[in-house]
Amino acid sequence: MSKSVAKITFYDDKNFQGHHYECDSDCPDFHTYLSCCNSIRVTGGAWVVYERPNFSGNMYILTQGDYPDYHHWRGLNDRLSSCKVIHLSSGGQYKLQIFERGDFSGQMYETTEDCPSVMEQFHIREIQSCKVLDGVWVFYEQPNYYGRQYFLDKKEYRKPVDWGSPCSAVQSFRRIME
């Protein structure tokens, strides 16, 4: 079984038109090649794309497929400047422990599945800490996989700032799979 080659192409116009820039590895700054990004085609791998250079600003998780305009990746605007390849876990195993309080305290829940609503599924208002035991995951600030996104790989996160969030507003999450 061969591993897919990572490849992402950014276009300055909608529907894959206009100038384009292609990446097959991490790129800390491509905004000098494209002044804006209105569509993306991912032909291999999974990616984190960032609004600002050096992997900063709002991030968006993209898997293989076509994104004909920035609304399709749930972007807030047409600004993207850097990207990273997501190294998916081998074996396809996923396991996440979430905690209602910081430093892994309070009620703990363990899951191996996507969650469109933390409130409905676990009856908690917010996630204050978590442990990614297997796989790579994305947290969303709103239910049903909307709002700001946060990429989490295999490690422990004692507080929301550890996964890049200024607050604990995680209302949904899912596994990142190719």
UniProtKB/Swiss-Prot annotation:
A GO molecular-function annotation: structural constituent of eye lens
Domain Beta/gamma crystallin 'Greek key': residue ranges: 6-44, 45-87, 94-134, 135-177
Matches recorded under InterPro entries: Beta/Gamma-Crystallin, Beta/gamma_crystallin, G_crystallin-like
SUPFAM superfamilies to which the protein is assigned, alphabetical: gamma-Crystallin-like
SMART domains from the UniProt entry: XTALbg (SM00247)
Signal peptide segment: none
Region ranges (N-terminal arm): 2-5
An annotated GO BP: visual perception
Region (Connecting peptide): 88-93
Residues bearing the modification N-acetylserine: S2
Coiled-coil spans in chain: none
Chain ranges passing through the membrane: none
UniProt KW keywords: Acetylation, Eye lens protein, Repeat
Assembly and binders: Monomer.
Record text about domains: Has a two-domain beta-structure, folded into four very similar Greek key motifs.
Role according to the record: Crystallins are the dominant structural components of the vertebrate eye lens.
Family as reported in the entry's similarity comment: Belongs to the beta/gamma-crystallin family.
Protein name: Gamma-crystallin S
